[in-house]
Structure formats: structure tokens, C-alpha cells
């Protein structure tokens, strides 16, 4: 689970303003950190299928936000992908 401090750090890193929580970049970065946390959780809890459903929903939401960002602001999309290390 993301702590309040981690969330503030992500918002400060990816946001355009100090309280920018609604931009696509910040939402994608927050989803990415939650997805990474859940992935670690599943290494220890392989049969937690209820949480797996939530993980799949988060991955799909991140995917749709990335598609939106790619359509609307390609330069910002490329920077975000590079910072998060999503594409290989």
C-alpha cells in the first residue's frame, strides 16, 4: 500500500503543480506504483484472486490513460514512459 509520503512524492515528481492530482501523468504514476505493490503481494499470496481482479482493473485503467496521453500529448507520453520504465 502506498503511504501518504510516497503519494506526495509521486505527485511532486510527475505533477505540473504542487497539488496536481488529476493530470494523466500523475494518475498513471500512482497506478503504476500501486500495481508494483500488488505484484509484490502476489509473489507471497498466489491464491489471492480477489485482489488479482483489482490488479487487472488497475492495469486496464493505466492502459487507457496511457492511450489518452499518447493521443493528446505525445511528448509528455514519451517522457513518462521513459521515467517509469514501462516500455522495453
UniProtKB/Swiss-Prot annotation:
It comes from the Bacteria. Keywords: Ribonucleoprotein, Ribosomal protein, RNA-binding, rRNA-binding. InterPro entries: Ribosomal_uS15 (IPR000589), Ribosomal_uS15_bac-type (IPR005290), uS15_NS1_RNA-bd_sf (IPR009068). The keyword RNA-binding applies. Gene3D superfamilies: 6.10.250.3130, S15/NS1, RNA-binding. SUPFAM superfamilies: S15/NS1 RNA-binding domain. One of its GO terms (cellular component) is cytosolic small ribosomal subunit. One of its GO terms (biological process) is translation. Pfam families: Ribosomal_S15. GO terms for molecular function: rRNA binding; structural constituent of ribosome. Signal peptide: none annotated. Part of the 30S ribosomal subunit. Forms a bridge to the 50S subunit in the 70S ribosome, contacting the 23S rRNA. HAMAP family: Ribosomal_uS15_B (MF_01343_B). One of the primary rRNA binding proteins, it binds directly to 16S rRNA where it helps nucleate assembly of the platform of the 30S subunit by binding and bridging several RNA helices of the 16S rRNA. Forms an intersubunit bridge (bridge B4) with the 23S rRNA of the 50S subunit in the ribosome. Belongs to the universal ribosomal protein uS15 family. This is Small ribosomal subunit protein uS15.
Amino acid at each position: 500500500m502506498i503511504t501518504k509520503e510516497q503519494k506526495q512524492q509521486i505527485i511532486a515528481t510527475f505533477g505540473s503543480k504542487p497539488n496536481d492530482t488529476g493530470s494523466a501523468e500523475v494518475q498513471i504514476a500512482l497506478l503504476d506504483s500501486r500495481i508494483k505493490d500488488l505484484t509484490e503481494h502476489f509473489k507471497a499470496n498466489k491464491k489471492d484472486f480477489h485482489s488479482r481482479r483489482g490488479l487487472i482493473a488497475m492495469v486496464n485503467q493505466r492502459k487507457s490513460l496511457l492511450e489518452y496521453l499518447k493521443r493528446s500529448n505525445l511528448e509528455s507520453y514519451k517522457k513518462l514512459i521513459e521515467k517509469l520504465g514501462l516500455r522495453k
